[in-house]
């Protein structure tokens, strides 16, 4: 679905890239936040017990939730990171700790 807002009730960020590409990039970015699991109120022990496929599944769910939530809430804390939607720049920024920053292009 190109060039529109996705989500049943108009939520989600405006984008021009394929949703799957954005979701893949956002999944990778949030996966770099070491305690991203805290977003789902998971304990470190539960996260440590997950195999890589399980962790990927959690990060994909997180990326999808963030994509829709950022349409109404442009700054969201995720563990020790922060995810920021900048509509004028057509990007989602992921701040990891105090210094590392990555971004996901939306167009």
Positions of predicted regions on the chain:
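Alpha-helical propensity feature that highlights long, continuous alpha-helices across diverse contexts
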Residues: 2-107
């Amino acid at each position: 679905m190109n060039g529109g807002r996705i989500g049943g009730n108009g939520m989600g960020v405006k984008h021009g890239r394929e949703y799957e590409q954005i979701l893949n990039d956002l999944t990778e970015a949030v996966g770099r936040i070491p305690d991203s699991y805290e977003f789902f109120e998971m304990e470190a022990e539960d996260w440590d017990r997950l195999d890589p496929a399980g962790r990927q599944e959690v990060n994909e769910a997180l990326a999808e939730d963030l994509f829709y939530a950022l349409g109404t809430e442009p700054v969201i804390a995720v563990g020790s990171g922060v995810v920021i939607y900048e509509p004028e720049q057509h990007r989602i920024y992921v701040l990891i700790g105090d210094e590392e920053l990555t971004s996901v292009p939306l167009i």
